[in-house]
């Protein structure tokens, strides 16, 4: 097919076949991912989850299937910001919209390709206890143990911390948290297989947090 994107796929019997329109499928996945993330943002706005947003604000990331690079991860340029309980975004989600978020997603996917969504929320003792009450699998990392070569390399801290938490825990958990460090706010990161699962987890945390009057 002249001018068409094509890829080679094994039939399963050792005979390769040509699968046309691979680029079209990828673009379809990108469009669905964009719609899913924008819908999630609208749900969070309606639920007024501002009480979960940390001082450094929040971002949400979603990797394409088989994501390999920053441009394969959808995130929000400028992050999600809060005003009281209300939240706002200054831009639509974009692929390659956040290197920091992409580093987390890509590191997670190296261990479990099915886990492609992440969102950071603020850390408090109460929120961590709520995550435990919800029976989430929880892991953590200690920023004070971050190697110097990682610390001085821009954007490497979250990649290192995510890797450390997962390898110590033994699998990809629902929650990865850290207690912060010098000029670093403590944080909880919610992990999920897709945006729908991520929304359910975050709303479960938010609703129990409000119910308990935290």
Regions found by a protein language model. Give the residues of each.
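Surface-exposed, low-hydrophobicity interaction/linker segments
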Residues: 122-175
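A common structural junction motif
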Residues: 206-214
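Short cationic amphipathic helices and targeting signals
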Residues: 117-119, 186-193
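N-terminal, charge-rich interaction modules
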Residues: 26-139
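Short, small-residue-biased leader/transition segments that mark boundaries at the very start
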Residues: 1-8
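Phosphate-binding loop/pocket of nucleotide- and phosphate-handling active sites
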Residues: 9-31
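Short, flexible, solvent-exposed loop/turn segments with mixed acidic/basic and small polar residues
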Residues: 105-110, 174-182
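Short, conserved charged micro-motifs
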Residues: 127-130, 195-201
């Amino acid at each position: 097919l002249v001018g068409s994107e094509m890829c080679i796929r094994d039939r399963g019997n050792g005979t390769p076949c040509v699968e046309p329109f691979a680029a079209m499928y990828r673009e379809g996945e990108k469009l669905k991912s964009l719609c899913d993330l924008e819908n999630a943002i609208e749900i969070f706005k309606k639920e007024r989850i501002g009480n979960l947003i940390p001082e450094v604000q929040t971002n949400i990331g979603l990797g394409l299937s088989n994501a390999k690079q920053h441009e394969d991860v959808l995130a929000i340029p400028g992050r999600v910001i809060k005003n009281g309980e209300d939240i706002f975004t200054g831009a639509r989600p974009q692929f390659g919209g956040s290197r920091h978020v992409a580093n987390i997603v890509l590191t997670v996917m190296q261990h479990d390709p099915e886990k492609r969504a992440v969102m950071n929320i603020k850390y408090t003792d109460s929120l961590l206890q709520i995550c435990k009450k919800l029976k989430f699998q929880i892991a953590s990392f200690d920023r004070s143990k971050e190697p110097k070569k990682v610390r001085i390399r821009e954007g490497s801290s979250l990649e290192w911390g995510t890797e450390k938490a997962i390898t110590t825990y033994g699998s990809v958990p629902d929650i990865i948290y850290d207690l912060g460090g010098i000029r670093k706010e403590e944080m909880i990161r919610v992990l999920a297989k897709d945006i729908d699962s991520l929304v359910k987890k975050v709303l479960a945390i938010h609703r129990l947090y409000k119910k308990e009057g935290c």
